[in-house]
Amino acid sequence: MHLSAHIDPLQIILCTEIDEACIQFIKSQIEGIARACGPRMQANFEGVLIPYVDVLGKFLYRACCLRYATMGEEAARIVLAKQDRSKGLVLATTGERMTSLIFSLVIDLVGVHVNKLLKQASYSSSFKLPFGLRNLLPEAVISKEKHLVYILNSFKPILLKLVSIIRFLCLTMKGHCATVSQLLLGLKYISLDEINPEEKKKVLTLLLLLGSRLIASILQHSNSYFDQHTISSITDERDLEDKNKLPFIPEGNRKCSLCMEFIHCPAATECGHIFCWSCINGWTSKKSECPLCRAFSSPSKIILLR
């Protein structure tokens, strides 16, 4: 089979969009299985799994497509190949796709743990920067480390989206691949269709598509950011790790069943269960029910505890 090195970057975008839709479908099925396990088991199960659902969904989808093309590759008419010194362009082997999958899995897991550390740091009153980093930063910056972590955590979705777009643009235009692991392994996408070499780089269209992603992310985050700060302006920053705050709450109920951390800004549903404000607000925005007893609960009925 003769393979041509030409490819339209828009084919890679189409491939990633379709693959992402498939991954989101698998993610929704995982959440459905968790709901079918019963309310209490569901809350405990999702409390541990929620940060890893995206990683698990991506791993399951990619693992099922190791020996075959993904849905995105089929639709975009592209294949994953590698440059061989003697044979030229050859199709990527199952082993190479497996290695790429493992690399991507490790990178995603590191990202999840960094995300958890940022969240814990923004909530913890005793958070300190690592010793090595404290030595590198000016004293004025160190004195405001808690505020820096809070700002970084608040605008993290926009920063991640911006980094993701820049990374994807560089990989697509220069490496003809979609992930860092593919670039490290020398894998790249090639088109099964004839591409005019002079028109294969539609930079303007590519920038418009990726720019629209960033704008959508900024608008979405701005709405949630202002919503959170409207609420935070009328609440104090209570953390139930301190037993002196809201002492009437039993010690066994001072951890959120959704994030499995000490409850931050405690809020109660109509049925009386207590969670972090951000956790239960996000939950009821998607499912109008209590995570523990499945009683009806809407975001407008959540009660902030003072």
Swiss-Prot record:
GO biological process terms, semicolon-separated: protein import into peroxisome matrix; protein ubiquitination
Localization (cell): Peroxisome membrane
Activity control mechanisms: The E3 ubiquitin-protein ligase activity is stimulated by PEX12.
Cytoplasmic topology ranges: 85-147, 220-306
Record keyword rRNA-binding present: no
Record topological domains on the Peroxisomal matrix side: 1-52, 175-202
Molecular function GO labels: ubiquitin protein ligase activity; zinc ion binding
Binding site for Zn(2+) 2: C271, H273, C290, C293
Alphabetized Pfam families for the sequence: zf-RING_2 (PF13639)
Pathway of action: Protein modification; protein ubiquitination
Renumbered zinc finger spans (RING-type): 256-294
Assembly: Component of the PEX2-PEX10-PEX12 retrotranslocation channel, composed of PEX2, PEX10 and PEX12.
Free-text note on domains in this protein's UniProt record: The three subunits of the retrotranslocation channel (PEX2, PEX10 and PEX12) coassemble in the membrane into a channel with an open 10 Angstrom pore. The RING-type zinc-fingers that catalyze PEX5 receptor ubiquitination are positioned above the pore on the cytosolic side of the complex.
PANTHER family: PEROXISOME ASSEMBLY PROTEIN 10 (PTHR23350), PEROXISOME BIOGENESIS FACTOR 10 (PTHR23350:SF0)
Protein's name in the database: Peroxisome biogenesis factor 10
Gene this chain is encoded by: pas4
